[in-house]
Amino acid sequence: MSWQAYVDDHLMCDIEGPEDHRLTAAAIVGHDGSVWAQSATFPQFKPEEMNGIMTDFNEPGHLAPTGLHLGGTKYMVIQGEAGAVVRGKKGSGGITIKKTGQALVFGIYEEPVTPGQCNMVVERLGDYLLEQGL
């Protein structure tokens, strides 16, 4: 399966619930900042933004004072899982990032998608990739 298929079929898919909803944007990005696959709506990011995110995985709390920046959008960092998941909130939407052995799995959402739905979609794929040694 291509990396693009993982984004299209497992991240940008309909989310089960009272109504079917989808993430706003999603991507799989290598630890070095190279994009493996992304939705057409995923923001163009700067290398320093990706460096900050990687630093937060290695040094949990690094982004808390400044916020998480991606594509020029600032998210307030909220409770995640140290070294494994970073979560951010901005208005009625937010972001979930799951770290695997070689990549970061990104999901960006807006209402009516809930933070829990975004977490579920992103972390499910991230856990699968970890099980595959990726």
Swiss-Prot record:
UniProt motif Involved in PIP2 interaction: location: 84-100
Classification via Gene3D superfamilies: Dynein light chain 2a, cytoplasmic (3.30.450.30)
Predominant cellular place of this UniProt entry's protein: cytoplasm
Gene Ontology molecular-function annotations: actin monomer binding
Superkingdom field: Eukaryota
GO annotation, cellular component aspect: cell cortex; cytoskeleton
Alphabetized UniProt keyword annotations: Actin-binding, Allergen, Cytoplasm, Cytoskeleton, Disulfide bond, Phosphoprotein
Pfam families assigned: Profilin
Organism annotation: Olea europaea
Miscellaneous comment text of the record: The variability of the residues taking part of IgE-binding epitopes might be responsible of the difference in cross-reactivity among olive pollen cultivars, and between distantly related pollen species, leading to a variable range of allergy reactions among atopic patients.
Phosphoprotein recorded as keyword: yes
Annotated family: Belongs to the profilin family.
Modifications the protein undergoes after translation, according to the UniProt entry: Phosphorylated by MAP kinases.
Compartments where located: Cytoplasm, Cytoskeleton
InterPro entries: PFN, PFN_euk, PFN_sf, Profilin_CS
PTM-bearing positions, type Phosphothreonine: 114
Role played: Binds to actin and affects the structure of the cytoskeleton. At high concentrations, profilin prevents the polymerization of actin, whereas it enhances it at low concentrations.
Subunit structure: Occurs in many kinds of cells as a complex with monomeric actin in a 1:1 ratio.
Name of the protein in its database record: Profilin-1
Disulfide feature: 13-118
